[in-house]
Design a protein with these regions (language model features):
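Local beta-strand N-terminus motif with an aromatic residue
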Residues: 12-13
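Structural motif
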Residues: 7-8, 37
Length: 173
C-alpha cells in the first residue's frame, strides 16, 4: 500500500468511513489489514456497500442505455454475455471497463464477514437495508431494513439487501 501508517496513536483516526468503497477494491483483505494501522485502538471503521447479488449490485445504473441501466440482475450474467450485452447497448469502453472491474471485485455479505474475521475486526453493529436510505433522496422511497429473520439466511440475503452497513472495531486478541 502506498500510504505509510501513522507512527503513534495520536496521529491515528477515531473514525474511518468506507462508504461505497470496498466493492471497488480488488485486494480487500490487504486493504483492510493496512487500514487497521490507521485506526486508533478505540476507533471504529464504518463499511457500507451494496451486496453483490442485489438487483443493481453491479452498478449498472451508470449505463447510458435505458435497458442496461434499468434492468436488474444483468451483472450476474456470465462475463462474456454481460460484456456482449453492454457492447450491444453501445456502452462506452470506459463504462464497460468500470462495470467489468466491479464484477471482478464483487463483494457479498459472506465475503465481507469472512474478511472481518480474517483481519481480526469485531462487529459492533450491522444493518441490512431492503430499501437503501439513499433511495429516499434519489427515488423518494422510504428506507426500510430487511426483516431480521432474513439477516440469518446466508447467500439468499444478498439478493434482497440493497445496502449493508457495518461498524467495526479492532478485536482485542
Amino acid at each position: 500500500m502506498k500510504y505509510h501508517a501513522p507512527i503513534n496513536e495520536e496521529e491515528k483516526f477515531d473514525v474511518i468511513l468506507l462508504h461505497d468503497v470496498i466493492e471497488h477494491v480488488p485486494a480487500k483483505g490487504e486493504f483492510l489489514l493496512h487500514l487497521k494501522s490507521f485506526l486508533k485502538s478505540t476507533g471504529v471503521l464504518f463499511v457500507g456497500f451494496p451486496a453483490w447479488q442485489m438487483p443493481f449490485g453491479g452498478h449498472q445504473q451508470i449505463c447510458r442505455s435505458k435497458l442496461c441501466s434499468h434492468f436488474p440482475f444483468i451483472h450476474l450474467l456470465p462475463n462474456s454475455m454481460y460484456n456482449s450485452l453492454l457492447k450491444l447497448c453501445k456502452e462506452e469502453d470506459g463504462t464497460i471497463s468500470e462495470l467489468m472491474s466491479i464484477k471482478e471485485c464483487r463483494t457479498s455479505i459472506e465475503l465481507l464477514e469472512k474478511l472481518i474475521k480474517r483481519c481480526e475486526f469485531s462487529v459492533v453493529d450491522k444493518k441490512f437495508w431492503f430499501i437503501n436510505p439513499h433511495y429516499k433522496q434519489k427515488f423518494h422511497l422510504t428506507p426500510s431494513l430487511l426483516p431480521r429473520f432474513a439477516w440469518k439466511i446466508k447467500y439468499a440475503r444478498n439478493f434482497f439487501t440493497t445496502s449493508c452497513w457495518y461498524i467495526l472495531n479492532l478485536s482485542n486478541t
